[in-house]
Amino acid sequence: MPVNEYGQMIGESMEGYTSGELPAIDFLEGRYARIEALSVEKHAEDLLAVYGPDTPREMWTYLFQESVADMEELVTVLNQMLSRKDRFYYAIVDKATGKALGTFSLMRIDQNNRVIEVGAVTFSPELRGTRIGTEAQYLLARYVFEELNYRRYEWKCDALNLPSRRAAERLGFVYEGTFRQAVVYKGRTRDTDWLSMIDKDWPQVKARLEAWLAPENFYKDGRQHKSLREF
């Protein structure tokens, strides 16, 4: 730990440090998943099954968004999402079918400190618990650390949303604490769990994710040999 001229411990020097760039993703492609910049024209038809009236009601409990009634409302919602200048939205596409199965966003971007959050994660039931969903998260994290060269990658969720927190920890995010009464939404109070991954974590996290995603870790029917937590 560095020590200054007064004998005080201080953080590591960041000599030559510069601020970060904003995301500029057209697409990212893996074995199973393809991330594409969200497009109403390209993705709305598929995303009606993700955001529409037939989705499970419990899917929306911890999301700021609610399900939509029809295509007209979905188009309005997607256009509102795309109009935001502080967030970058992406569709998660199954490479095997070309179908969009979910969306997520890079948001709360602090360029000066190279901090960014993955949020607004909206996965269809079809996407949850799949290689496609895990690989999509891997591709986005790899972009954050290896292309944008950001230092800190965040995940936040309602403290009562245990599936979200478990998903984050499975991917390699580390729980840091709970911000009490941080948000009011849907007419109720919310404590918010904060989790993060930093650049020093990424090499080990990357190795685990790549080992789990490798074809040899799966049977022909798609079942895994080893869970991600076993790596």
Name every feature range the model reports, one short phrase each.
Residues 1-130, 143, 147, 188-192, ...:
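GNAT-family acyltransferases
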Residues 133:
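Glycine-rich acyl-CoA binding loop
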Residues 140:
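Flexible ATP-lid and adjacent glycine-rich G1/G2 motifs of the Bergerat
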Residues 146-156:
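Conserved GNAT acetyl-CoA-binding A-motif
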Residues 155-164:
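Conserved beta-strand-loop-alpha-helix junction that forms the acyl-donor binding cleft
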Residues 167-168, 195:
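Conserved active-site tyrosine of GNAT-family acetyltransferases
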Residues 174-188:
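Conserved catalytic-core motifs of GNAT/GCN5-like acyltransferases
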